């Protein structure tokens, strides 16, 4: 019989079903409100106040899944989108923004719908109107917003973006076009330290709110064997970012462009795109290599079979969960630890949110099917 008891306050340590004293309730799941804390289990050392976390605490903590904006292409975090002037970056930004706001697939990639803010800082509203109407006709979406002016990072850009997020809590993507428009002006603006600092500040913001910041930037004029060495400025920009896209053409007049993609938590890709000059959109022509996928995990497959759109939730103890999982033979505390470290994949591949809590009665886990189409 399915146990659908209501879960209580979230909790911290891992183990089997042992009962805990009623005087103490711990939590081991990071919620949306404290995404800015990278390691919830971190504790201050008595020596110099260094925040540390043990490997045990690391494994015993459930971290929020890194949500995709566009599957296998763009995730929450801070990314650079780099290309030569007039290569077609702004058309791509408009196309991406529209698809995310509408929830429409981008070529063969699934898109997760949400509000989009596009800071088109090198444009005016009249030009935006002409460009978008040429790309998409007059079919509009109410959750795609534009601004043509914004403060710099040092003068309060983060407060402006925070205000927008408060008004639109379902924001998934913010595009800054271009980086030069929001960076400080100074003699050392191209030093490694200043480049690293500005992207780090943007990344801190995107991590705090669990959104994607996509920052448009230019390539340098000199050629390089590695396309990512063509990013204008120093390696500090790429070093601090979660990933980068490099768009380049062999000749400026070509319709075809290569889009090289790298990221911390995603496979490298090289896409071939062709620009449709009539509609001013980029069309997918092919990828250099097939995306490598992790092989199926028997444990996650078994968990996924438990939940259906008709019965999208289950909660109970780890021991009760083991009884429901056919073909899984491990100890209860090992089960929770394996699910802890697989929470991101369980959510992104199967659409299942996993929570692990310690209550007065003992360990309790909760599984919720949030997206049956994952």
Predicted regions and their residues:
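Core recognition of P-loop NTPase motor domains used across DNA-transaction enzymes
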Residues: 2-75, 87, 130, 138-141, ...
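Phosphate-binding/switch region of NTP-binding enzymes
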Residues: 80-82, 86, 90-91, 119, ...
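Hydrophobic positions on the alpha1 helix immediately C-terminal to the Walker A/P-loop
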Residues: 92, 96
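Conserved inter-motif catalytic segment of the P-loop NTP-binding fold
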Residues: 46, 56, 64-65, 69-70, ...
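Post-Walker A helix-loop "phosphate-sensing" segment adjacent to the P-loop in P-loop NTPases
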Residues: 99-113, 347
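Helix C-cap/helix->beta junction micro-motif
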Residues: 168, 205-209, 350
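DNA transaction DNA-binding modules
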Residues: 272-374
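Pre-Walker A (Motif I) flank of P-loop NTPase domains
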Residues: 75-79, 114
């Amino acid at each position: 019989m399915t146990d659908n008891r209501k879960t209580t306050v979230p909790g911290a340590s891992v183990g089997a079903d042992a009962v805990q004293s009623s005087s103490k309730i711990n939590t081991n799941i990071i919620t949306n409100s404290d995404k800015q804390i990278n390691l919830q289990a971190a504790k201050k050392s008595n020596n110099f106040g260094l925040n540390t976390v043990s490997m045990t605490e690391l494994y015993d903590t459930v971290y929020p899944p890194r949500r995709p904006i566009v599957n296998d292409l763009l995730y929450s975090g801070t990314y650079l989108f780099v290309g030569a002037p007039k290569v077609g970056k702004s058309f791509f930004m408009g196309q991406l923004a529209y698809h995310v706001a509408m929830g429409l697939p981008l070529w063969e990639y699934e898109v997760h719908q949400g509000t989009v803010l596009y800071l088109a800082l090198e444009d005016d509203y009249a030009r935006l109107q002409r460009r978008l109407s040429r790309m998409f006709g007059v079919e509009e979406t109410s959750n795609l917003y534009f601004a043509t002016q914004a403060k710099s990072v040092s003068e309060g850009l983060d407060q402006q973006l925070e205000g927008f997020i408060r008004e639109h809590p379902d924001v998934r993507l913010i595009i800054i076009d271009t980086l030069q428009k929001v960076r400080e002006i100074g003699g050392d603006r191209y030093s490694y330290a200043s480049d690293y600092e500005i992207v780090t500040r943007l990344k801190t913001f995107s991590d705090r709110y669990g959104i994607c910041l996509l920052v448009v930037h230019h390539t340098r004029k000199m050629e390089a064997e590695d396309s990512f060495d063509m990013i204008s400025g120093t390696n500090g920009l790429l070093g601090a970012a979660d990933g980068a896209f490099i768009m380049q053409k062999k000749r400026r007049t070509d319709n075809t462009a290569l889009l090289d993609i790298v990221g911390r938590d995603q496979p490298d890709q090289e896409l071939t795109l062709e620009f449709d000059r009539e509609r001013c959109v980029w069309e997918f022509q092919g990828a250099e290599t097939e995306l490598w996928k992790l092989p199926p995990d028997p444990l996650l497959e078994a968990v996924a079979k438990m939940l259906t759109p008709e019965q999208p939730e289950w909660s109970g103890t780890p021991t009760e969960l083991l009884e429901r999982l056919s073909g899984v033979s491990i100890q209860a505390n090992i089960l929770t630890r394996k699910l802890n470290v697989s929470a991101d994949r369980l959510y992104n591949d199967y659409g299942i949110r996993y929570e692990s809590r310690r209550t007065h009665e003992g360990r309790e886990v909760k599984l919720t099917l949030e997206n049956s189409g994952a």
